[in-house]
Amino acid sequence: NVTSTYSNGCGIFDISFCSATKYFSGHSDAMGGSLAVNQKVYKKIMFFYKLSGYRMSADEAYLIIRGLRTLDTRLKQHYENTKIIINFLKKQKKIKEILYPHNPSSKNYKLWKKYYSGATGLFSIVIKSKKKSSVISFVNSLELFGIGYSWGGFESLAILQEIKSAKKDEYLKGRQFYRFNKDEFIVRLH
């Protein structure tokens, strides 16, 4: 839910990478990514970089640089719009939970605050419903949101996320994974 703009990745990790396809370009018309490394791994990464031949095309670079010029303004507006939508959704009976770590009522707010300085417009809602078809109808009826997976572009999108199973994994080291009941559905919004 954040871009590298709001995180201090290299202050925490040796390698930080992110998609430049989403918020960086801002128009959903370019594909690329960024990689930032600290001095500890720089030589290894540069060796692989030279060996692999991976390069971004000039057109993709141009489109992403164009988007970077307005990134800060767009992210601030995404966040402001998201606050308005979340405040509206909090009052809806069918909404069980809003999954957005920047929200002070979020279970993960303290953890988010420790590592990030801002937020974007991507969040999910947990809808309580006896029928999946009702949730599909809800998503299809949205007038200001298109249907799709991408985010960070110029349009608002929504998609019903299919949750097959959610279980505790070893790598979580005791942290609680979200548990969903049969009558709960996730809709991702941007």
Task: Enumerate the predicted regions with their spans.
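Conserved PLP-enzyme active-site core in the AAT-like
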Residues: 1-94, 99
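Conserved residues at beta->alpha junctions
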Residues: 36-39, 129, 190
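Conserved C-terminal alpha-helix-loop-beta "cap" of PLP-dependent enzymes
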Residues: 97-188
